[in-house]
Amino acid sequence: MTKMNVESFNLDHTKVVAPFIRLAGTMEGLNGDVIHKYDIRFKQPNKEHMDMPGLHSLEHLMAENIRNHSDKVVDLSPMGCQTGFYVSFINHDNYDDVLNIVEATLNDVLNATEVPACNEVQCGWAASHSLEGAKTIAQAFLDKRNEWHDVFGTGK
């Protein structure tokens, strides 16, 4: 397979075992700042996906709440394949801490009573949300917290 420019296109999606959180890449800026991009994979690629209303609400909830747990978050974005998210941190390379930040953020999702910015002024598709869908996705991921480090399902 020819090496592609996009890191995830070089990942053999048939070999990974969701759920997991993996370091997808790093980038160093001219002044020495380092961005660490993580793949938060909720669903098994090409086998299952998150339904859009739940995914959309999960995106809003995670993007808003993750910043309460770390001031190093640059961005949190959904994958177009609807199997996960990317989260980027600046100058923060502690993998175990990233797992704890994601865990705390997903617990915030479970405790949410509304979806932030779920209106036509602040959201581009405000009609497509499901708080309950987001909570279901979050709970399923949290239920497998002990597997998040095991990208290839090897038990290591």
UniProtKB/Swiss-Prot annotation:
What Gene3D superfamilies does its record include?
S-ribosylhomocysteinase (LuxS)
- The answer on whether this UniProt entry bears the keyword ATP-binding reads no
Q: Give the matching SUPFAM superfamilies.
A: LuxS/MPP-like metallohydrolase
Record-level GO BP terms: L-methionine salvage from S-adenosylmethionine; quorum sensing
- Cellular component GO terms, alphabetically? cytosol
| Residues given in the record as Fe cation binding sites | 56, 60, 123
Query: What is the enzyme's main class?
Result: lyase
Question: Which cofactors are required for activity?
Answer: Fe cation
According to UniProt, the reaction catalysed is: S-(5-deoxy-D-ribos-5-yl)-L-homocysteine = (S)-4,5-dihydroxypentane-2,3-dione + L-homocysteine
Q: Which UniProt keywords apply?
A: Autoinducer synthesis, Iron, Lyase, Metal-binding, Quorum sensing
Q: How is the cofactor bound?
A: Binds 1 Fe cation per subunit.
What InterPro entries does the annotation carry? Answer: LuxS_sf, Metalloenz_LuxS/M16, S-ribosylhomocysteinase
Function noted in UniProt:
Involved in the synthesis of autoinducer 2 (AI-2) which is secreted by bacteria and is used to communicate both the cell density and the metabolic potential of the environment. The regulation of gene expression in response to changes in cell density is called quorum sensing. Catalyzes the transformation of S-ribosylhomocysteine (RHC) to homocysteine (HC) and 4,5-dihydroxy-2,3-pentadione (DPD).
Its subunit composition reads: Homodimer.
Family that this chain belongs to: Belongs to the LuxS family.
Q: Which HAMAP family match?
A: LuxS
**What is this protein called in UniProt?**
S-ribosylhomocysteine lyase
Organism for this UniProt entry: Staphylococcus aureus (strain NCTC 8325 / PS 47)
Lineage runs: Bacteria, Bacillati, Bacillota, Bacilli, Bacillales
